Design a protein with these regions (language model features):
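Domain-level signature for proteins that mediate thiol-based redox and metal-cofactor handling
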Residues: 1-193
Length: 193
């Protein structure tokens, strides 16, 4: 039966550098200009969509950003076996216009607890303008957490969390760029979730 009045949702998948994650791109904005990570089922209170995705026994992480959902699967699951099921679920869920994120349920925590200095502003701008777009293309996100005595702490989310190549990207790519562009930066480290 054809539904009328609701948009037709199309979904395609993109592989990420992390073999355990897959990016499901949708022709609809899910969480415009924002991202939110659900590393486990207990953290899904703000997202009915994430909560339902965790009912699949092979899902171990959900990340929602702009127009895509990045899912992390269990090691014993083959993507080829579950992609059609996930795509069908997402299509039906979104065509029914069900809630993706309930903003009022999000508990915000301060991202930075130190002085907002010129160095911190430059770090945030570099992350926002250079790093974040590249990381999002791979189905992940990076969030600034802290800066203290030359050490920048970031949180890796989505496909970046647990990715075998994330430490290479962090050290060779992000840390190298920050050291060149912001001389005060001595090291970039990732905070575990």
């Amino acid at each position: 039966m054809i539904k009328t009045g609701n948009p037709i949702i199309s979904i395609y998948t993109e592989m990420t550098p992390n073999p355990e994650t897959m990016k499901f791109v949708v022709n609809k904005l899910l969480y415009p200009n924002k991202s939110i990570d659900f590393p486990d089922a207990a953290s899904t209170t703000p997202s009915p969509l994430a909560a339902e995705l965790f009912t699949f026994p092979f899902i171990r992480g959900v990340f929602i950003c702009s127009n895509f959902v990045t899912l992390t699967k269990t090691n014993d699951t083959d993507w080829a076996d579950v992609i059609p099921t996930i795509k069908q679920f997402l299509k039906e869920y979104l065509e029914d216009n069900r809630a993706v994120i309930n903003e009022e349920e999000i508990v915000t925590t301060p991202v930075f607890s130190g002085d907002e200095s010129d160095v911190v502003q430059r770090i945030k701008e570099l992350l926002e303008n250079y790093v974040k777009p590249a990381v999002e293309m791979d189905g992940g996100a990076i969030q600034f957490k802290d800066y203290h005595e030359g050490v920048v702490t970031v949180m890796l989310q989505g496909s970046c969390s647990g990715c075998p190549s994330s430490m290479i990207t962090l050290k060779a790519g992000i840390e190298g760029m920050m050291k060149r562009m912001i001389p005060e930066v001595k090291e970039v480290v990732a905070e575990a979730e």
